[in-house]
Amino acid sequence: MRIKDIVTFVSKTITPKQGVTYNLYSLPSFDDGKTSERLDGADIQSNKYDVPNKCILFNKLNVRFRRVWKVDNQDENKISSTEFLPLIVNEKVVDFQYCYYLLISDSITNYLCGQNTNTSGSHKRIDPNNFLNIEITLPKMSIQKQIGKTLSALDHKIEINKQINDNLRASRAQSQTQFELCRGEAVNADVSPNLPLLDRSLKGAEACLVA
């Protein structure tokens, strides 16, 4: 069995139109919290792939970063960078969640890292045909579902912990800023009333020196 036996690469291209709002799945938006961008077609510079309602977007550029995106929503006008391969999962053969974790597995990632084409500098792309022809072995569907469910639950917990840590860091930064502001106000409050006395003391000292 090969990857092409469990997913279908959908290569329908879209030319964005001015005045139409699109949900764009791009590499920058993946890196920035995996949230698609809402853009007018006039702000999108090139043709994109149409994104099915339920699919997996597999990035063919620099696969070592594992930019693999699960999509499962009814949003209209979903499009993606052509650096992604939109893959519809054959759920009669493979569990959707299991398929996702299979595609980001070390074995597939390491294999593809050795199959890069167009390799120059930091931009290394895979050949989609090489990817789709990778041989795989699937466990029974019941085992797939169990594995997919377990790994998905772990990822969910990791994401929640990340959000908690991000909020704590933001809260600490805000508290530190407020502390610095309050400390500055306290210093000014302590020093300001004494400025006339300080000024007179300096003048007195100068008078003594002159005498």
Residue ranges and their predicted role:
Residues 1-14, 30, 137-211:
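Non-catalytic DNA-recognition/assembly elements of restriction-modification systems
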Residues 22-37:
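Short, basic/aromatic beta-hairpin or loop at an interaction surface
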Residues 47-49, 53-108, 121:
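A short beta-sheet element
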Residues 36-46:
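Short alpha-helix capping/helix-loop boundary micro-motifs
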Residues 1, 78-85, 119-148:
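A short glycine-rich beta-alpha junction/loop motif
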Residues 16-23, 113-116:
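Short coil/turn segments at secondary-structure boundaries
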Residues 68, 85-90, 132-138, 152, ...:
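Short, well-ordered beta-strand elements within core beta-sheets of diverse protein domains
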